UniProtKB/Swiss-Prot annotation:
Amino-acid biosynthesis listed as a keyword: yes
Comment on bound cofactor: Binds 1 pyridoxal phosphate per subunit.
Cellular compartments annotated: Cytoplasm
Pfam short name (any one): Aminotran_5
Pathway this chain belongs to: Amino-acid biosynthesis; L-serine biosynthesis; L-serine from 3-phospho-D-glycerate: step 2/3; Cofactor biosynthesis; pyridoxine 5'-phosphate biosynthesis; pyridoxine 5'-phosphate from D-erythrose 4-phosphate: step 3/5
EC number: 2.6.1.52
Binding site for L-glutamate: R43
Cofactor(s) in the UniProt record: pyridoxal 5'-phosphate
Binding site for pyridoxal 5'-phosphate: A77, S78, W103, T153, D173, Q196, N238, T239
Keywords of the record: Amino-acid biosynthesis, Aminotransferase, Cytoplasm, Pyridoxal phosphate, Pyridoxine biosynthesis, Serine biosynthesis, Transferase
Protein name according to UniProt: Phosphoserine aminotransferase
One Gene Ontology molecular-function label: O-phospho-L-serine:2-oxoglutarate aminotransferase activity
Amino acid sequence: MSKRAYNFCAGPAALPEAVLQRAQGELLDWHGKGLSVMEMSHRSDEFVSIATKAEQDLRDLLGIPSHYKVLFLQGGASQQFAQIPLNLLPEDGTADYIDTGIWGQKAIEEASRYGHVNVAGTAKPYDYFAIPGQNEWKLSKDAAYVHYVANETIGGLEFDWVPEVGDVPLVCDMSSDILSRPIDVSKYGMIYAGAQKNIGPSGILVNIIREDLLGRARSLCPTMLNYKVAADNGSMYNTPPAFAWYLSGLVFEWLKEQGGVAAMGKLNEEKKRTLYDFIDASGLYSNPINLTDRSWMNVPFRLADDRLDKPFLAGADERGLLNLKGHRSVGGMRASIYNAVDINAIKALIAYMAEFEKEHG
């Protein structure tokens, strides 16, 4: 087999090679059963055991309290933008949202279709290069919930603190930084995360929701989007994306083998520090984000001359450094350095960036 490339894609993102190798080995014959996970009935004892273990491993990794349900859902985080207000926002209620970038804005736009949304805080005055402090927010007195995006994958802003909202349920999109380091789940009413960045392949979403928030769905909420229906049916009201669920479970096992999220947090801190330090010391590359708000997982950077973008990307591709092109809405470059992207990938990227700067700087 040819050497695997270093994949800096924002999502679907790199998966641990050990996970891919195990899935390859089990593809035709899972545990001697003579069939693939893709061919199993989701009601079978075999698949139920896969699903049960995946949930327990995730609970172990994040220290999820027993009064939280763990749901494996379909539709990705974008579907949650509608599903959240349908389940948690009364028709005459208000939801507070924090705008720190494109994904926060999409959540606000969708929620506004179902009720009153108060944009309690926004990074717009800072041109989305910094997160407004909570002292700048204007939270509602009676909000049904407060929603924010922990890490904006496109802009490269990330909260390094948890908002204090009292008894109001805190709802967080952690699609791109879940499992990157320890968190206190008990501070949240609900956490949701699309899988295709730090969990597994696309097609499945993890939802961690406090039990008292179940059963609040509006009458018009489709059955398939009702959190309580999903919880009551073990996330199997209909046929789930079984193979994506299985692969996510393998990633959870791999994370435990690496020492869990505490160990992963130390590795991720080293990775992001190494890359940002190089960028900051460079004369060709720059990152505009406020130092304390820089993302651990998604590192956007620009070259001093946009005309160098194409040759930079071409040279990166030749060296097996893939998917470094920034999001179409902002341009530039972006290195997504999720859990499966190890320090060797960072070192290889920096070596190339230094070489390119020597030639073009």
